Amino acid sequence: MDVAPTVADRRSACLAALAQGPARFHEPRRTDCPWCGSPRLRVLLRSTDLVQRKPGTFTLDQCAACSHLFQNPRLTPEGRDFYRRDPHLYGAREGLGAPLADRLLGTRTTDRRHLARALALRVFDEPECWLDVGTGTARFPALARRVLPYTSFDGLDPGRRIEDAVRSGRVEEGHRGSLPALAHRLAGRYDAVSMFHHLAGSPDPREELKGARLALRPGGHLMIEAADPECRYARLLGTWWPGCAQPRHLHLMPLAGLRAELKRLGFTVVAVDRRAPHVPADLAGALALAVNSRLPQGDVPWRARPAPLLRRGLRRAGWWASVPLLALAHALDRLLAPLLTRTGFGNAYRVIARRDPG
């Protein structure tokens, strides 16, 4: 599909939303940590939207008491919707096309990774009913059936993609909305609940965890994968670390904080893995963000005038010129992964927790 008509159609609405400035998309700034309540906060980093380059500046604060990282001030619901729109205009995917960009950056979850997730839970249980939260197009449930053929998979997602997933047969049942809002309706229905890189984008991860506990039967398992803000890549790359993902990530939770909250809610952690969930894309992702920040911006709906053909041509040429460097960075990501994940560079963790009785 040609992108230009979509950009033209979106321009008036986008400019109207920005007429009062991007500050309107932020809630009041917090003076305490949303995780532990401590007032001991420090600014960890400030960033612009490095992927889409929409207007605005975003701050990640870190709590000195519990090390929780959170966007402060946080985006409002309207702001989150604004910055998550226009997925076809995401940096390298727009400049090189989605298939090549995903291959060079190594960010798309592979079939092997999905199967490994299912196998990780199968060690503890072969669930009868599994709910995948934030399922999107439901690729995980569709693939997990290969190793869990007797499990019924349902999906939950706020977007229309969940309806397509039901029609295509990737999930048995689809729930559109958020888990905190739907949890009472789903109470006690599932033996397993999964959240893969879902909590970081949630306004309130604690409510998501409460919803997961409510949806699970006693003895059921919760599987979580999340970006690890304590990894060495996060400190080395700073703003350019793809795991920061501003403004889309609202929370980055240290593993200890998540484990403590799971225990408080009545879970027993049965497995933790900081190696297998690693996505080998840090160097390539950081390079792509740097390239994107220096190229002329393409034809986007948040600029008042359409981009001239020359500017669009220069942008495409710049992306194609960067392909050899991106390919080299991707190769290094993959080659170094076995070593780096043993030395604190793993960029994600996986937690499997069992809901206690009662």
Feature-to-residue mapping (PLM):
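Short, glycine-/aromatic-enriched active-site segment of Class I SAM-dependent methyltransferases
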Residues: R10-A17, I224-L252, A256-K263, P277
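Short glycine/proline- and charge-enriched loop/turn segments
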Residues: A98-P99, L237-Q246, A286-N292
